[in-house]
UniProtKB/Swiss-Prot annotation:
UniProt-recorded name of the protein: Protein Smg homolog
Disulfide bonds: none
Cited InterPro entries: Smg (IPR007456)
Organism: Coxiella burnetii (strain Dugway 5J108-111)
Family: Belongs to the Smg family.
Pfam short name (any one): DUF494
Length: 158
């Protein structure tokens, strides 16, 4: 039985389907059957696929970007869910040009959707990787993030 986690489903999909194919048909019955055969429960699979759908939709939505000389202030709600280490990690990714204001906001929004999983830096790394994967204009940032995430999970998910 797989660990009942939306993140585990997302990690499996990324490592076994998205990296190879660059696309993923979320409605494909074969995919649902495969995930269930691996031991994932249908409710967790549905949550993961819904999360991916939301990411795909959010990534296409126009977003008003902040001024170049502005800085991000986290709300009390965000601070409750994203500890200091998580916020520092996001700021570091932006300073290293892995994230820009648009992708940073996507990462925060998508991470907050997984708040029941318990948000930590490990989860943020995977969320960031999947957000960048869905941004066709962010190939260089994606490559940097892949190195950061996949190096941390040697022997992780098969």
């Amino acid at each position: 039985m797989k660990d009942e986690s939306v993140l585990n489903v997302l990690m499996y999909l990324f490592k076994n389907h998205m990296q190879e194919n660059c696309t993923l048909d979320l409605g494909e019955k074969k995919l649902l059957v495969q995930l269930e055969e691996l031991g994932f429960h249908r409710t967790v699979i549905d949550q993961a696929l819904s999360w991916l759908n939301n990411l795909s939709y959010s990534a296409r939505e126009p977003m008003q970007l902040p001024q170049k000389n502005s800085f991000r202030v986290f709300s009390d709600y965000e601070c409750d869910l994203l500890d200091t280490e998580c916020r520092r990690f996001l700021i570091t990714l932006e300073q290293q040009a892995i994230l820009n204001p648009h992708t940073r906001e996507l990462v925060i929004n998508q991470a907050l959707e997984l708040s029941c999983e318990g948000i930590d830096v490990s989860l943020l790394k995977w969320v960031t990787l999947m957000v960048l994967f869905n941004q066709s204009s962010e190939k260089e940032a994606l490559a940097s993030m892949e190195l950061l995430v996949l190096d941390d999970t040697v022997g992780g998910i098969h």
